[in-house]
Regions:
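A short beta-strand motif characteristic of beta-propeller blades
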Residues: 69-81, 124-149, 183-200, 237-244, ...
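Post-signal peptide N-terminal segment of secreted/secretory-pathway proteins
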Residues: 50-156, 161-163
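Bacterial Sec-dependent N-terminal signal peptides
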Residues: 1-45, 236
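Structural motif
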Residues: 54-61, 106-116, 173-178, 224-231, ...
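Repeated scaffold domains used in trafficking and secretory/extracellular systems
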Residues: 32-35, 81-91, 135-161, 195-210, ...
Length: 413
């Protein structure tokens, strides 16, 4: 799906397959109980609706464990919109962090901010950062004149270790925000000097960035840089370790163990020259590398191009056909033809998302696509535990251009 009003020519970004560390030996506050209630129930699902930015603000839909769905959760609780053109969210230590570009005021309604922090159980707003709040010191080597530089939209992805270590990205690079002081710094080595922050491909891509303990992992690559896996550390504004990878672009990252990642890389859109690489994060070594003759591109979407459930890796490469790869036999098969269940669908709004705990697959589609068009759409929920997919739920017009879907259980890993 070519979402030109969102991305322009930028190809960086990520669905979030990350868990928040439970380490309490920091000033990030006391973590809540392992499992929470309300909207933080691990059996629930959060839908982040980007919305048609010229006609509506972003919103939250919540799919409850009993299968019922609640629309516009944040507005119901707070009486306002969290932001315009929602991009990503994360949950950590009982807080929800919602990120938006927040450039437009549809129907003359301003969103609360670019980054909104809310209570995870209630969605009650607690803290807001506007674009004016989020400026960072000019990096060494930059040709910009001003000492403090603004973020560039689109914003991309967010991963939170604690309130002192909020990592997020835009097309310039990766940033670390201390949510208690508002201090924002760009991570050294991630700034795109190639074209002063307006590169065709960002050096560090945060699509699929993953937190394990005190470390954050994301990959990078593109036209001007070698493809690598990067490690960042709590409290640090520098890259800790780098590991070279095969492939040109980043599709996504899946966490496959306590200290193991599966990194998916690919060629240009439409290319079937892809790679899957297993990495041991303790030894910082590649344990398995397999070429894959399939298009696993994440396209222009802000979520991971691959998603894992059981022994299968699922992907759609921006199409309305969901394929899966067996990690046992390494065979690829077409698994779901979306138009069989949503005949009017024409566009994927985000990459497919799996819930590995319940063996469910979420596919979000729309009938139209436009920054001012509020389109009909479907969120299809499939049981993928068997050889054939089983449609469990078809949610019609319960979201608006969902930019990502978050089974809440992923935040408790």
């Amino acid at each position: 799906m070519k979402r030109v009003w969102l991305w322009g020519a930028v190809l960086g970004a990520s669905a979030l397959l990350n868990g928040c560390t439970s380490d309490t030996d920091n000033d990030g506050g006391t973590p809540p109980p392992a499992h929470q209630e309300g909207y933080a129930d691990p059996d629930g699902v959060i839908l982040l609706n980007q919305g048609a930015r010229m006609s509506e603000n972003g919103s939250i839909s919540y799919l409850a464990p009993d299968g019922s769905i609640e629309k516009d959760v944040y507005r119901t609780v707070n009486g306002s919109a969290f932001g315009n053109e929602a991009m990503d969210l994360d949950m950590c230590n009982g807080k929800i962090y919602i990120m938006s570009n927040n450039l437009y005021r549809p129907n003359n309604e301003a969103g609360d901010g670019c980054l909104v922090v809310a209570d995870a159980e209630t969605f009650r707003r607690e803290k807001v950062f506007t674009a004016d709040d989020l400026t960072f010191p000019r990096p060494e080597g930059s040709l910009e004149e001003q000492e403090m530089l603004p973020l560039l939209t689109p914003l991309e992805n967010i991963a939170v270790m604690d309130e002192h270590n909020i990592f997020f990205s835009d097309s310039q690079g990766l940033f670390r925000l201390d949510g208690t002081t508002g201090e924002l710094n760009i991570v050294k080595g991630s700034y795109a000097f190639g074209n002063q922050g307006a590169t065709i491909e960002t050096v560090v891509s945060t699509r699929g960035m993953t937190v394990i303990g005190d470390h954050l992992y994301c990959a990078g690559g593109g036209f001007w840089s070698e493809t690598k896996l990067f490690e960042f550390t709590r409290g640090s504004d520098e890259v800790t370790r780098e590991l070279p990878l095969k492939g040109e672009f980043i599709s996504g990252i899946c966490r496959t163990g306590d200290h193991e990642l599966l990194v998916a890389t690919c060629g240009r859109s439409g290319s079937t020259k892809s790679y899957l690489t297993y990495v041991d994060t303790d030894s910082w070594s590649i344990t398995l590398e397999r070429p894959l003759n399939a298009d696993i591109s994440a396209e222009f979407m802000n979520s991971s191009g691959v998603t894992l459930a059981g022994d299968y890796l699922y992907f759609a490469a921006g199409s309305l056909t969901v394929s899966r790869l067996s990690l046992k036999t390494w065979e690829v098969e077409e698994y779901i033809h979306v138009t069989d269940d949503a005949p009017e669908a024409r566009y994927l709004t985000c990459n497919v998302v799996a819930d590995p705990e319940r063996q469910l697959l979420y596919v979000s589609v729309s009938n139209e696509l436009g920054e001012a068009i509020v389109s009909d759409g479907n969120i299809l929920v499939y049981d993928c535990s068997g050889e054939e997919p089983v449609l469990k739920n078809n949610l019609v017009n319960r979201g608006s251009y969902p930019v990502n879907i978050y089974p809440v259980s992923r935040f408790y890993r």
